[in-house]
């Protein structure tokens, strides 16, 4: 059986080691052990020829910078170029199943141009993310003002929401309409799939975690620590909730006696959110630490006391899954697919934009050992089964066989 992955991530292509390819690389390394004939096609910044390595066939998809610039306002043209490249790969490789990773990319459009069955592996879903992109009280003008009227930053941040995401949402709706098979892992993505593709076949499949997380020791309550360490991992889009971090930290600073340090990974600064909220990071013990690797993150999680996930919309954030796997107590906003991850007491859910309850439960976890250990135990119990890589690969392989047996798109 020949399987073609269409991915925005090059997985293990030209990676220095087998642990550098993120969770898709983790899955690649394990699934080839099953003897699967696997090819991966992915966007790449240089015009590399197809090659074999790591037990797979690699097909880099190259679109030149000048063409991207020339067609910056003609997004359909870029999509057409990628689809043609994918058609060429299909003609060359002749797969039995095409496995597309992520509906936010154009690759899922290929279902309209081939008789080979396509299964979409849902990651985030653009349509509901677009609806929740701006936090309450935030607008184009408030973003511009919070950026100190820096129009270049405003263009990069707000224009992406105002122009690019609506196009992505329309394209994604078309992809869902023309795709029959879907992998998902939360109640939320299953419900959204049924709305956008009513006749779809939906298969549950969890995500593999990075080796550094899987190999990590498990978290233990730090009874003797004087300073509480709070950890969050985020990125630059405003819907990721950096403003909630600042609001929650302010409440902890002004209304509790706990001494804390809140380390935020994935970003080097959140100045726009500082101006929007009127809260300075240093004034409320928040420190942006930039990007770190998986080994460093595992160590930080192990030595933290609470993980806080502030996003206004998400499906199944790997950052939450990684904290849970290690056993670090999680507080998260109950949005999108997050409630599925934190079900049955495997963490604490708070309403969206509710810094008060977030602060309350952070304080409770930091000061109530029994409560913290109860959360940790449940997280470890659920995560062990959810992220078992053998179970995940069995699920994927079974679906591949079912799709081939069905013999339909």
Question: How does the language model describe each region?
Answer:
Residues 1-48, 56:
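N-terminal subdomain of nucleotide-sugar transferases
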Residues 4, 221-240, 246-249:
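Conserved donor-binding/catalytic core segment of Leloir-type glycosyltransferases
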Residues 26, 142-182, 191, 195:
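Membrane-proximal helix-turn-helix segments that form the acceptor-binding/catalytic region
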Residues 233, 261-275, 290:
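Glycosyltransferase donor-sugar binding loop
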Residues 273-295:
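Nucleotide-activated donor-binding/catalytic signature segment of Leloir-type glycosyltransferases, i.e.
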Residues 312:
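Aromatic "clamp/platform" in nucleotide-sugar-dependent glycosyltransferases that forms part
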Residues 329-332, 349:
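Short hydrophobic beta-strand element within catalytic cores of glycosyltransferases
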Residues 344, 348-355, 364-369:
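Conserved acidic donor-binding segment of nucleotide-sugar-dependent glycosyltransferases
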């Amino acid at each position: 059986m020949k399987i073609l992955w269409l991915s925005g991530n090059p997985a293990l292509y030209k990676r220095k080691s087998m642990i550098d390819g993120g969770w898709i690389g983790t899955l690649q390394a394990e699934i080839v052990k099953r003897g699967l004939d696997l090819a991966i096609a992915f966007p790449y910044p240089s015009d590399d020829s197809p090659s074999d390595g790591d037990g797979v066939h690699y097909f880099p998809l190259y679109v030149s910078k000048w063409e991207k610039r020339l067609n910056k306002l003609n997004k359909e043209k870029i999509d057409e170029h990628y689809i043609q490249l994918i058609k060429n790969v299909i003609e060359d490789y002749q797969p039995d199943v095409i496995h597309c990773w992520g509906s936010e990319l154009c690759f899922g459009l290929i279902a309209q141009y081939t008789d080979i069955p396509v299964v979409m592996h849902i990651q985030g879903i653009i349509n509901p993310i677009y609806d929740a992109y701006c936090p309450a009280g935030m607008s184009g003008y408030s973003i511009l003002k919070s950026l100190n009227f820096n129009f270049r930053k405003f263009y990069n941040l707000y224009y992406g929401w105002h122009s690019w995401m609506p196009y992505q949402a329309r394209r994604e709706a078309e992809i869902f309409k023309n795709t029959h098979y879907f992998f998902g892992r939360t109640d939320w993505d299953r419900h959204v799939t049924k709305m956008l593709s009513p006749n779809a076949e939906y298969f549950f499949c969890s995500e593999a975690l990075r080796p550094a997380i899987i190999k990590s020791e498990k978290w233990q309550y730090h009874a003797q620590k004087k300073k509480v360490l709070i950890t969050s991992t985020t990125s630059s889009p405003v819907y990721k909730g950096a403003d909630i971090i600042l609001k929650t930290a302010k409440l902890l600073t002004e209304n509790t006696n706990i001494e804390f340090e809140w380390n935020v990974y994935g970003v080097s600064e959140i100045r726009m959110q500082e101006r929007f909220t009127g809260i300075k990071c240093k004034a409320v013990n928040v420190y942006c630490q930039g990007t770190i690797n998986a080994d460093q993150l595992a160590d930080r999680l192990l030595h933290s006391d609470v993980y806080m996930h502030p996003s206004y919309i998400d499906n199944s954030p790997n950052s939450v899954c990684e904290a849970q796997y290690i056993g670090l107590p999680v507080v998260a906003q109950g949005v999108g697919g997050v409630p599925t991850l934190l079900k049955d007491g495997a963490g604490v859910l708070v309403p969206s934009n509710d810094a008060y309850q977030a602060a309350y439960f952070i304080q409770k976890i930091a000061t109530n050992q029994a409560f913290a250990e109860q959360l940790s135990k449940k997280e470890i119990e659920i995560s062990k089964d959810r992220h078992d890589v053998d179970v995940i690969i069995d699920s994927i392989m079974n679906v591949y066989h079912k799709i081939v047996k069905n013999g339909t798109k």
